[in-house]
Amino acid sequence: MDFGIVTAKIDEIGYITHAENLGYSHCWVTDSQMIRSNCWAVLALAAQQTRRMRLGTGVNVPGLRLAPVAANGIATINRLAPGRCFIGLGTGHT
């Protein structure tokens, strides 16, 4: 069984590293622009501070972010955490 964590703020990065140390396998970072931290910045910091945890958005809202910007964001995270990233797409704000 896998366990994951959801976070939204860059100052909660300690939760992500603690969750990895406890054996959590995934981290989803919400993409709520203007409300929470930039998801790509949080994921980049998490990529630097974790070694095994899979990292991605939960969820990226296509109607609020241009596709090339989202593609560049996840590609950058993949460079920092090769093979450990994913992108969740959806309507968000639920």
Protein language model features and the residues they cover:
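Short glycine-rich, polar/acidic loop-and-turn segments at beta strand-coil junctions
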Residues: 31-33, 59-63, 91-93
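N-terminal beta1-alpha1-beta2 module of alpha/beta enzyme domains
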Residues: 1-58
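Generic, well-ordered alpha-helical segments
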Residues: 34-38, 62-69
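Flexible, glycine-rich active-site loops centered on histidine and acidic residues
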Residues: 1-5, 64-94
